[in-house]
Structures are given as C-alpha cells and as structure tokens.
Swiss-Prot record:
Signal peptide stretch: none
GO molecular function: DNA binding
Main localization (coarse): cytoplasm
Protein name: Probable transcriptional regulatory protein SSU98_0387
Keywords: Cytoplasm, DNA-binding, Transcription, Transcription regulation
InterPro entries: Integrase-like_N, TACO1_YebC-like_2nd/3rd_dom, TACO1_YebC_N, Transcrip_reg_TACO1-like, Transcrip_reg_TACO1-like_dom3, Transcrip_reg_TACO1_YeeN, YebC-like
UniProt xrefs under NCBIfam families: PRK12378.1 (NF009044), YebC/PmpR family DNA-binding transcriptional regulator (TIGR01033)
This protein's GO CC annotations: cytosol
Amino acid sequence: MGRKWANIVAKKTAKDGANSKVYAKFGVEIYVAAKKGDPDPETNSALKFVIDRAKQAQVPKHIIDKAIDKAKGNTDETFVEGRYEGFGPNGSMIIVDTLTSNVNRTAANVRSAFGKNGGNMGASGSVSFMFDKKGVVVFAGDDADAIFELLLEADVEVDDVEAEDGTITIIQLQLDLHKAIVALKESGIQEFNVTELEMIPQSEVSLEGDDLATFEKLYDALEDDEDVQKIYTNVDGF
C-alpha cells in the first residue's frame, strides 16, 4: 500500500505541475468551500483542507487567492456535486465525482466519455458498494510503529500504517482524518504529500496490453473533463 500511494503521488504531481486544468478544478473547489462558509481558512476547516490539498498538488498561490476573492464577491454562481459510476475493461470499475454549474452538461459528457472509450455507465451504487471511504495521509518518515502509537494515543481509529521507501502511509476512518492530521502536526510533522478522503477498493485488478491501453484512454478522457474533480478505481497503479 505504501509503495502504491508513493507512486501515485509522484505520477500525479508530475502531471499536475504542467496541467492548468488541475488548477482550474481546485479553483472551483476552493471557491465552493469559501462560499459555503467563512472565506478565511483559519476559521473554515473545510476551506483549509482544500487549500492544503491544492498546495500538495502544486497549485500556485495566485490561483488559490483568486478563488477566495471570487467567493468574497457578489457572484451567485452555484455548483452542484455529483457522482457517476461505471465499468471499464476486464473487471475494472470507476467512480467519478463531479462539481459543476451545469448538471446536464456534465452528465452528458461523462456518459460520452464512457461510451466512446470502451466503458459502460452503471446505475448509482453499482460500483461504490465495492469501495470503502477512508482517510489517507502520506508523508516522509520511516517509523510506522511510532506513528501508529501516536495516533492511538490521540484516539484516532487506524486501519493501517505502513513505512516503505522513506514514506509513511496511513489509512484510517474518514471521520478521523482531521483528527489524525491535527495529531501529526502537534507531533511536529508539518509537510504532507497526501491528505485525502478516498474511495478505496476492497480488491484490485491488474490490467495489461490492450485492456490497460483502453482503460488509460477512458481514465484520461474522464480526467480531462473540467467538471470532474476526482476519479476512483480498482485498477492497480491508478
């Protein structure tokens, strides 16, 4: 698990650094979080959480500030959260979370991405029941036992703590994610590679050859949609 998250973080960071679409997606998410509550991250924990994630993805400060300033203004633009589920080749499954100001456009685009790239849309719940919502925290370190004990002392329920290649990965209950981050920061850990709520598959599949190529094409088509915020899958390495 530790190596998986380290590899995903490295691959995603490399892509995000050159992808303005990622900046735009975080801009929307920051705007929505700021609009729902106080635009000050020090008093709005949801906003602070999004900003921290944006920084992990190397989103420039001016993008973050612009989204917050927009939320402070008189704009009444409304965004709606959505979730779509579907299937790719050879047992692969995908969950797509969206944030959009035009639900009809988003639904049509997601359906088209599945249909044109070797996938099939499923009904609500057809995939998500095979995933568990968990908190994931990744940071530099090598003493998993010490971190496990620290979290237990902070009354954080932990599923797993692994140390591999100088990286510690924590998987824990979604409701304890904020508590885990606070406990880690109080212990002196300030830099994180990942602090996310994730849908983690109960089992994974490995794809090769044409199946892998088809899946990558489908995944990229969904990821390129400006309304798609997150993609979860049971395919190893994604």
